[in-house]
Amino acid sequence: MKRLIALLLVVLIAVSLYGCAGEKSKGPEPGTPLNTFYQAIMDAQPENAEELILFEESNPDLIASFYPGLDSIELSQQAFYMPPIATHPCEIVLVEVKNDADVQKVADIFQARIDMGADNTNYPESAAGWQLYAQVQKSGNFVCMIVLPEGYVIPENVFEV
């Protein structure tokens, strides 16, 4: 009888612990507005930091010049935030791809943009910013390329709002 009670207690504890494990995050829901992530990035900045000035860019020729190959990938949504001065290392690009097989392709395109900025020998200070403060993040069908100036915060997971 004691063994049966002990066994039942072990099973009960195991079931309780399994219930406490929680559900792993699968990433953002498809169709989550990209502005949600952009605003979360802006809200994460230190209070004493100067306000970041970025403009939403929609010119397809300009976008294609910075992100060659991106125009051949089917996107559900896209948002490009660029600084007023093109050589300033401060960009936030957020996309949601329609086909999950394209996530890595987009990440590679974004990494190529980072590499291009980091290799800019005409503006060594700008290149240093791209080398030190730029990254690509992925979650589900969402991909982000972000570079912010020194002293600003890139969230560990841009897509965790």
Role assignments for model-derived ranges:
Residues 1-8:
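Positively charged n-region of N-terminal signal peptides that target proteins for export
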